[in-house]
Structure formats: C-alpha cells, structure tokens
C-alpha cells in the first residue's frame, strides 16, 4: 500500500495596510500558489524569524514601505488540496507621506470592494471582517439585537455590567458577530462570548489614557472620539474604527457643541480608521455622511 505523503505546513505572514479607510491589494501571478487571484502583501516566515518580523520584511521587499507599528489582526489555519497554511495577519496604517514609496502595481480598494475581488479561500474570513457595515444602532436593550436591519450593528450599553454575560447567554449566538460592547462589559463576558462579539468599544477617556501595550492583540477596537487629538490617539494605539461626535445637536447631550458636517469631514478624511458619524442623525442621513468622508453612521433614536 502506497504511503501517504504529509502535506507541507507553511507559516505565512500577511499585512493589511490601510490608508484613509482603504486597503492595499495586489495580484498573484499564474505561476504562484493560488495564482490569478488578488492578494494582500506578505510571504513565508523564514526559519528563526518571528511572524511579525516576517511581515515587516515582506512589506519592505514587496511594497517598499518600512512601517513602525504593526497590530495583530487574526490567525487562520487553512488546508488546501496540496498544502496547509498557517496565516498570521497584521494590520498597519500608512501615512500620506509614504504613498509615493509604494511600488507598482499595488492598488487601494475600499473595504466594501474587497468582497467582489477573487482572493484565495483562506482569506475569505478576513475579507468579511474588513467589510464593516454602514449603520450602528445604540441601545441599552439587548433584544434590539434580534431586530437589527440588514447592514446594522448594535452597540449595546447595558444598565448593569454584572448581568451582561447572563443576558447574552439568552441570545442567538449567531447574532453576536453584529454586537459592539464597551471594554468593561467585554471583560465580564465568557471567553466564548468575547471571541464572538464584533468589536470592543473604548470611551473617550479610556482612549486618551491607553497605550499600545494596553490593548489585547487580535481584538478589534472601536473608539469614541470628539476631536483630532482623540482620533490620532485611537489610531496610534491600534483601533480599527471610531465614532466621531457630535455632528449635530443631540437630545441625549444637548449641552455638547455640534461640530457640523464641514468639521466632521475635515477630521474624518485625515483619519485612516473607519469613522462613523454620530450625534443627532437618523437613518436617512447615511448618504450625506458618506459624502462627508464617513464610513457610516450611528444613532440612538432613529436607527
């Protein structure tokens, strides 16, 4: 009986490079493994090399960028017919000053455009994670999770942190991937629940006092920001998205001065994160928000 040969197991590091909420994508040639498909920058981890150093080296060699901060994004182990790949994903933000250094033929794509590109199968969960929805409903009522429209997340703000895990246990676990909770709530959840929620939110004061080392690598963080300083700080520590508020006067915080769409646009277009407009908005304001460089909108009363 012919002895079966074990499939090679290859360690790979891959970079998700982001600039102004767009992702850098290339093309795999026909003679490469999984050729004639789109790809993110990256390559094999060499013997004795750490995955993050491999990522940094590959980006320098392939793209021409020597970036300082990489944040762990995900880990995927995928079995093809001929090989097993262990994929270490990292993400990094690219400054405007570095754009001219990028080698050809890399191209920037919007997050929602990625789902229309033919990537290797192992990348499918990453494409899904990068394609952030456009609307976020904010509520204290966890039952709203069962009533979300298509294309919505729920940012849940429970009255009692202590009961959060018990309440979530009563919900359909398939819906947790559309849930955002504050870090204090997240810490009280079960390990399984922590893995299933979409993002962990940081309040403004939490963002401003945190350092890169305070964030758990591989977790998606969503910051609450009110100005240029907090947006910059959120991006610096590795947040992937942010609320920017208040755009308009709100019933919940009438004393807060509204920034208006012009100021919002000026701040949002300078950020590399996915920025959501928040404050005095209703669902029909999405088209306006997109014109002013928002990735999407969020609201309490009208979502």
Annotated model-derived regions:
Residues 203-211, 241-255, 281-303:
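Glycine-rich phosphate-binding active-site loops on the catalytic face of alpha/beta enzymes
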Residues 37, 99-155:
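Nudix hydrolase/Nudix homology domain
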Residues 76-100, 112:
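Active-site-adjacent beta-strand/loop module that shapes the phosphate/pyrophosphate-binding cleft
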Residues 179-198, 209, 226-237, 264, ...:
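Catalytic cores of alpha/beta
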Residues 19-62, 178-180:
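Conserved Nudix-box catalytic region and its N-terminal flanking loop in Nudix hydrolases
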Residues 136-144, 150-233, 243-246:
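Catalytic beta/alpha-barrel core
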Residues 256-264:
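Charged helix-capping and loop-helix junction motifs
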Residues 2-24, 75:
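Conserved N-terminal beta-strand and adjoining loop/helix that marks the start
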